[in-house]
Amino acid sequence: MNYSLIQISDCHIDDNKYSMGVNTHINLKKIISRISHINIDVLLITGDLTHKGSITSYKALQQMLYPIQIKLLIIPGNHDNKNNLSATFSKNLFSQFTLGKWEIININSVQVSKTSGFLTKDELIKLELNLAQSIAQYILITLHHPTVPMNSTWDDSLSLENPEALFNVLDKYHKIQAILFGHAHQAAEFKRLGVKIISCPSTALQFNNETRIGFNYYTLYDNGQLTINTQWI
């Protein structure tokens, strides 16, 4: 059986509807309207759900997501407030999730009060344990921060600070098919040792010359193949 997954990222919902010079509420509603007409199994949000982390902004986001009555998986970003995010979306935060022969494993790359990401020793140990114990045939890794240079105007110093520590763990496991992240506000795809490395565009605005908003649509196949279609509005 094949599965469909949509990834959105960096919504930056704020109390006054505007952040970074755009109405992030209207933009996200456009994305949700498009997604609500697509038959999918999982919606994944890879961080920065809100801009300042207020409880009211999470409640507003919760209301906006209501039309999408499917499994929702959420990971935090550097703009998120851990306590307020957990208070609103505790049932949606995850470390592992199974989809047939596939497993999605999340790692937390967020540092308190820093824009860039870092994987602590404890986080790497947990990742290694999750990978070693996984009975899935194929694995997706998710985190907020980019794990490779973006080859764009993006400032790579704001990405994951210790990607080599991550790859030292991941390179031991050949079941990993892709790494998905956000943070860079741009669509991009790379490949490393046969593993797809995929950046998701923002629902708010992009940091490159792209003027549209968008999301990534994935199909996970029973044979381990993964296809991606970035959709723009």
Swiss-Prot record:
Q: Which residues bind Fe cation 2?
A: 48, 78, 144, 183
Pfam annotation, one family: Metallophos
Any idea of its EC number? Answer: 3.1.4.-
User: Which keywords has UniProt assigned to this entry?
Assistant: Hydrolase, Iron, Metal-binding, Nucleotide-binding
Q: Where does Fe cation 1 bind?
A: 10, 12, 48, 185
Gene Ontology terms, MF aspect:
3',5'-cyclic-AMP phosphodiesterase activity; metal ion binding; nucleotide binding
The record's free-text note on cofactor binding: Binds 2 Fe(2+) ions per subunit.
The record lists AMP as bound by 12, 48, 78-79, 185
- Top enzyme class: hydrolase
* Cofactor(s) required, per the database record: Fe(2+)
Against PANTHER family, the record matches this protein to:
CYCLIC NUCLEOTIDE PHOSPHODIESTERASE CBUA0032-RELATED, PHOSPHOHYDROLASE
Q: Which family does it belong to?
A: Belongs to the cyclic nucleotide phosphodiesterase class-III family.
The name under which this protein is listed is Probable cyclic nucleotide phosphodiesterase COSY_0614
